[in-house]
Amino acid sequence: MAMAMRSTFAARVGAKPAVRGARPASRMSCMAYKVTLKTPSGDKTIECPADTYILDAAEEAGLDLPYSCRAGACSSCAGKVAAGTVDQSDQSFLDDAQMGNGFVLTCVAYPTSDCTIQTHQEEALY
């Protein structure tokens, strides 16, 4: 006697695709912070939700900041925090000493307070 197998697959109704830079629900917050970016062409203050990477918020605000991997695995988007705090636990490039000196990778950094970041700091890392 032959046995028949049947598999069914269904997509969740109303499921939204993952958004790059969106924090998991356990880390989400409704807060938004003022992030001042000190660029070679001048200072620009943007509003950055706590669940959005600083680089993504800057691009949405029309700024053109350097980046390459968008994964925290290189130094193209390096900046230096002059004031405030960020969460960059998604990065894998900077060592403890570099982070202790204020360096941040804007492509994987979330603001955790109002902050000021000097952008275009890749060369200062070395």
UniProtKB/Swiss-Prot annotation:
Classification via Pfam families: 2Fe-2S_Ferredox, Fer2
Keywords: 2Fe-2S, Chloroplast, Electron transport, Iron, Iron-sulfur, Metal-binding, Plastid, Transit peptide, Transport
Necessary cofactors: [2Fe-2S] cluster
GO molecular function: 2 iron, 2 sulfur cluster binding; electron transfer activity; iron-sulfur cluster binding; metal ion binding
InterPro entries xref list: 2Fe-2S_ferredoxin-like_sf (IPR036010), 2Fe-2S_ferredoxin-type (IPR001041), 2Fe2S_fd_BS (IPR006058), Beta-grasp_dom_sf (IPR012675), Fd_pln (IPR010241), Ferredoxin_transit_pept (IPR023383)
Subcellular compartments: Plastid, Chloroplast
Gene3D superfamilies: 3.10.20.30
GO cellular component, one term: chloroplast
GO biological process, any: electron transport chain
Residue intervals passing through the bilayer: none
Residues binding [2Fe-2S] cluster, per UniProt: C69, C74, C77, C107
UniProt remark on cofactor binding: Binds 1 [2Fe-2S] cluster.
Coarse class of the protein's main subcellular location: plastid
Subunit: Forms a complex with heterodimeric ferredoxin-thioredoxin reductase (FTR) and thioredoxin.
Name by which UniProt lists this protein: Ferredoxin, chloroplastic
Species whose genome carries this gene: Chlamydomonas reinhardtii
